[in-house]
């Protein structure tokens, strides 16, 4: 039931890291909410269609590229400005997280190495990694398993309001779903 609100909160946090926290006006936050709801509604429609068609293929989760395309299609000037700011992270040199992940999430022990990422990508990468980790926590919870999470470089989340809120909620959610977080 919290799937879409949690995903939209992640999009807000990720976009704040990209465009700057001071740019996150109520209009920007509302646009992110609208586009996020639209994007995940389309995803849920694809899921339902896959069930009806008896398809064994699950639709892929939306990517930041999908979010960017929908944002760019909005009529408001603020949406156009946000899309321009996001462009480097979708089509440009910082497009590390714009596509489906190449990390094998079926391993029991997963390490995300961020050492070689540009400094401008560190905060954003930590948020993307936590979102991926959260999906694993949910999967393990459904199987009755605990998930142990070690977060190095925790201080990176403390540099912005959205980062602080995201990590706080992440830790609280993990505890409710048998996640054990060590900082």
Residue ranges and their predicted role:
Residues 1-179:
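P-loop NTPase motor domains
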């Amino acid at each position: 039931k919290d799937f879409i609100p949690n995903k939209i909160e992640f999009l807000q946090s990720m976009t704040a890291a990209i465009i700057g926290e001071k740019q996150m006006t109520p209009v920007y936050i509302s646009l992110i909410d609208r586009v996020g709801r639209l994007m995940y509604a389309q995803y849920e429609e694809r899921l339902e269609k896959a069930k009806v068609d008896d398809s064994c293929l699950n639709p892929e989760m939306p990517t930041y590229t999908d979010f960017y395309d929908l944002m760019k299609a909005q009529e408001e000037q603020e949406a156009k400005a946000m899309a321009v700011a996001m462009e480097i992270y979708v089509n440009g040199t910082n497009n590390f997280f714009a596509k489906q992940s190449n990390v094998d999430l079926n391993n029991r022990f997963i390490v995300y190495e961020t050492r070689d990422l540009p400094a401008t990508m560190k905060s954003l990468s930590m948020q993307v990694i936590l979102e991926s980790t959260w999906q694993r926590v949910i999967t393990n919870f459904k199987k009755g398993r605990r998930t142990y999470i070690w977060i190095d470089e925790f201080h990176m989340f403390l540099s912005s309001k959205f980062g602080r809120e995201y990590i706080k909620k992440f830790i609280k959610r993990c505890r409710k779903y048998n996640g054990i977080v060590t900082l």
